[in-house]
Design a protein with these regions (language model features):
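Membrane-helix boundary connector in multi-pass membrane proteins
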Residues: 95-110
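Membrane-water interface at the C-terminal end of transmembrane alpha helices
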Residues: 119-135
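Cytosolic juxtamembrane amphipathic/interface segments immediately preceding
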Residues: 3-14, 73
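Select subsegments of transmembrane alpha-helices in polytopic membrane proteins
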Residues: 17-26, 80-89
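Short, highly charged, low-complexity non-transmembrane loops/tails of multi-pass membrane proteins
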Residues: 135-154
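Membrane-embedded alpha-helical segments in integral membrane proteins
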Residues: 27-39, 94-97
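Membrane-helix boundary/interface segments in integral membrane proteins
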Residues: 61-76
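Transmembrane alpha-helix entry/boundary detector in multi-pass membrane proteins
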Residues: 14-17, 37-58, 80, 109-111
Length: 163
């Protein structure tokens, strides 16, 4: 029953939305990484921020997957669902704490926050598009057309006595 209700809700994502999702992911991640590479901070600080974006992207994709699994009626454990949400919150909190204590200009801090959030949004949107397209590919079949090419037709015999 959950599958039927989901089937009516899943629409094929438009090409524009697919493209914008990929652009958001690539732009956000590239801006964050380039900004990190060009930043004048210690190597261990750069490593901290690099791990945060990697952890954040994984947590965001995992959360999107688990929410979609629940919609499709796939059993999801409460502990994993909670861990996914906790990972997102922890990741954003660690970024906020790290930037609060960093000796960066306010504009740089804002840049990192925006690039980070754009990356997370892009990752979730790309994952959603992939999942939607896969669902539509596997759950919608084109109407079956009978193949009569090798069939030999037999004349139908009518019993006129039955009339």
């Amino acid at each position: 029953m959950a599958e039927e209700s989901l089937r009516t809700q899943v629409n094929k994502p438009s090409s524009a939305f697919i493209a914008v999702s990929w652009v958001a992911l690539i732009t956000g991640a590239a801006a964050y990484i380039i900004g990190l590479f060009n930043a004048s901070m210690l190597l261990n600080e750069k490593g901290y921020y690099l791990i945060l974006i990697l952890y954040g992207l994984f947590a965001a994709v995992s959360l999107q997957k688990i929410v979609r699994d629940k919609l499709e009626g796939i059993q999801v454990t409460a502990i994993y669902f909670g861990l996914c949400w906790a990972s997102i919150v922890i990741c954003i909190a660690l970024l906020a704490i790290g930037l609060w204590n960093a000796s960066l200009e306010l504009s740089e801090k804002g840049f990192y926050i925006m690039a980070f959030l754009l990356s997370l949004f892009g990752a979730v949107a790309v994952q959603k598009n992939i999942r939607d397209l896969d669902y539509l590919r596997t759950h919608t079949q084109p109407p079956s057309v009978p193949n009569y090419s090798n069939t030999q037709f037999q004349p139908i015999e009518h019993d006129e006595e039955k009339n």
